[in-house]
Regions:
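Single, function-defining residue in the core of a domain
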Residues: 2-192
Length: 192
């Protein structure tokens, strides 16, 4: 019976450095922990996240801070619902605000979110040496295809994935993939 810890980490994609982290138990969602990290972001930043963070609420909160998002999503990105085609496998679509508020978000924050968001959907193949070619679909608030070509958007997402693999390697090398302490205080000490 091992204690379990949930961590959400904000990394710099340029350096790989940990900028901030939020910790919690398994009853706390990753989205709620991510909400604790929002004050570490600045206008002009770009958050690259996995599908758990590609939600209307996260993207709307980030846009409210002047922060852009790039990542996968669990929402439908059906090309038939696109509002404007930007190129092959590249289009804009509108996300409507969900009918129900997110459980982890305060009602005042929910009320302040816009009724809809425009996001860009880019679909394509990404390759990483040693791995099979993958077809991915990402959403982003980087809407201008001239400034952010589709191929570069996909490559940026791939860099996030490589950083995640490096984190897994680091945990194994430092023998931190399985923490030995049982109390939260000792686990924090072991991590630092």
């Amino acid at each position: 019976n091992f204690p379990l810890l949930r961590l959400v980490v904000l990394f710099s994609l340029c350096s790989g450095a940990v900028l901030a982290l939020a910790e919690g138990n398994l009853r706390q969602s990753e989205l709620a922990l991510f909400g604790l990290l929002l004050n570490n972001l600045a206008k002009g930043d770009i958050v690259i996240g996995d599908s758990g963070f590609g939600s209307y609420v996260v993207v709307a909160l980030l846009r409210g801070l002047g922060v852009d998002f790039l990542g996968r999503t669990t929402r439908s990105t059906d090309g038939r619902r696109r509002t404007k085609r930007l190129g092959k496998d590249d289009w804009l679509m509108t996300w409507k605000k969900p009918a129900r508020p997110s459980r982890w978000l305060a009602l005042a924050q929910w009320a302040g979110l816009p009724a809809e968001l425009t996001v860009r959907v880019v679909r394509g193949q990404v390759t990483c040496k040693g791995f099979r070619v993958r077809q991915v679909t990402v959403v982003t608030t980087l809407l201008d295809p001239a400034l952010y070509p589709a191929k570069e958007v996909l490559q940026a997402y791939l860099r996030r994935w490589r950083l995640e693999m490096c984190l897994d390697d680091l945990k194994t090398t430092l023998k931190m993939d399985m923490l030995r302490n049982r109390s939260p205080e000792l686990v924090r000490q072991e991590l630092s």
